[in-house]
Design a protein with these regions (language model features):
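Extreme N-terminal starter segment of soluble prokaryotic enzymes
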Residues: 1-5
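Active-site-lining helix/loop region of Rossmann-like oxidoreductase modules
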Residues: 8, 16, 134-256
Length: 272
């Protein structure tokens, strides 16, 4: 018997979930829910029902798990606790500083409804979290380092696009080479958030938007840009489509530690 899956939100993440379902014989895509006109959504799977997001509760007894593919900035903090009242839910909430708060909200809703809520199971937090866990088990005396990029952060790009005056935008997370090399060399440096990464934004403005105001909102945004050296470029919509239409990304989880009676052996575990 297959597990019946619903997908809430059909962007890049939603399509990725659809591809993953195809590779698992015990999963079945039952329905896709969207805030767009359902008739405008073309799924990769044939004969899958596409519904308005507002109709999702009508599927309460037809879906076993609802996977939420919205953004962490404004969608998931509202959606995950709300839909946990009706479904078992999974999300990839990735605003690290707000995970305890998000956990409490989802936990309360799921316990009250008798459902299961699984949060923050994306890339990081998610896969990278698992790699940190096993590396810590192997090298208990050591330090963790995580570097993201160079690549597009969909969460940060989504946060940019929600600013008034922004028509579209992409954000690249870029590791600081000197910091990365110091870690790989086993130097165990003490690094601030700002010393590990820079952020580069390519933004298309709405007509009449205040460029300086938008730039300030980006650079001072808590949990996203305020702790980083951030560069904002204003470009045309055509430039964005031509040069920044992809969503490549990468990253490195590194555990540097020592073993031996006198801690005489140095080791580095790296996952990318």
């Amino acid at each position: 018997m297959s597990i019946r899956i619903g997908i809430m939100g059909y962007g890049n993440l939603g399509r990725g979930i659809e591809c993953a379902i195809k590779q698992n014989e015990d999963l079945e895509l039952t329905a896709v829910f969207t805030r767009r006109n359902p008739e405008s959504v073309q799924t990769l799977s044939k004969d899958v029902t596409v519904c308005k997001a507002s109709e999702v509760t009508d599927w309460k007894d037809k879906i076993d798990v609802l996977i939420l593919c919205g953004g962490s900035a404004t969608d998931l903090p509202e959606q995950t606790p709300e839909y946990a009242k009706y479904f078992n839910v999974v999300d990839s909430f990735d605003t690290h500083a707000r995970i305890p708060e998000h956990f409490d909200n989802v936990d309360a809703a799921a316990k009250n409804a008798g459902t299961v809520g699984i949060i923050s199971v994306g890339w990081d937090p998610g896969m990278f979290s698992l790699n940190r866990m096993y590396a810590n088990a192997i090298l208990p005396n050591g330090k963790d380092y995580t570097f993201w990029g160079k690549g597009v952060s969909q969460g940060h790009s989504d946060a940019i696009r929600r600013i008034d005056g922004v028509k579209d935008g992409k954000q690249y997370t870029i590791p600081v080479d000197a910091a990365l090399e110091a870690v790989r060399n086993g130097e165990n440096p003490e690094l601030t958030t700002r010393q590990k990464h820079t952020r580069e934004c390519f933004v298309v403005l709405e007509d009449g938007a205040d460029a300086k105001k938008v730039e300030n909102e980006i650079k001072t945004m808590p949990n996203y840009f305020a702790d980083y050296d951030t560069t904002v470029h204003y470009i045309s919509e055509e430039e964005l489509k031509e040069n920044h239409s992809g969503i490549p990304h990468g990253g490195f989880v590194i555990r540097s530690g020592k073993t031996g009676w006198e801690e005489e052996n140095s080791h580095v575990i790296e996952y990318s």
